[in-house]
Amino acid sequence: MFSALPAYAGLTSITAGYDFTDYSGDHGNRNLAYAELVAKVENATLLFNLSQGRRDYETEHFNATRGQGAVWYKWNNWLTTRTGIAFADNTPVFARQDFRQDINLALLPKTLFTTGYRYTKYYDDVEVDVWQGGVSLYTGPVITSYRYTHYDSSDAGGSYSNMISVRLNDPRGTGYTQLWLSRGTGAYTYDWTPETRYGSMKSVSLQRIQPLTEQLNLGLTAGKVWYDTPTDDYNGLQLAAHLTWKF
């Protein structure tokens, strides 16, 4: 596998992880295991990820495999881009197709502006166009970020979300703790009404990256999301863990 990388490429990390989400009521659960490689090639950083997932409902079960890759490229001191693409089996586990293009602009000291576009095709040929913009502020060991995202779904129309995150770096070492808070809307269509109905969504997630040795990091994540739809209210509890070996 590694021989496929160019001679001037340097493998920087390998990650293996597991992610479990349990939904309330009859919404089932989702299991995800993945392996990930990150390599550095001159001004580019390359990511390769292979995931295996399972989505269980009360009476139905789906399995799927997803492959994805991303390239971060530093054009100069103030412009960095990220291009990502992913493909998966046609099931409710993952999006079938996923393409994203992000642009990061360091136009002010200790400030990073971000904008981007994302196209996703889901199970049953539902397509979603996503536009997002945000800003990150770097103040000592704290990184504070805000992002606004607009979604345009082929079957339900528009919705949006607002996300705030705060990351606190450890005084020494590479460990950190990060909190995400988000709130937004959801658009839904039903056979029994010609009108698009709207609901809401909110979530909270906390992650700890803990160095175990100079090369090995442990990541632990816990989160919860609440869905308020026109026909049902439910929530999902997420627990995730990963190990990263750095070269």
Give the positions of each predicted feature.
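Outer-membrane beta-barrel translocator/channel fold
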Residues: 19-34, 49-70, 84-102, 106-239
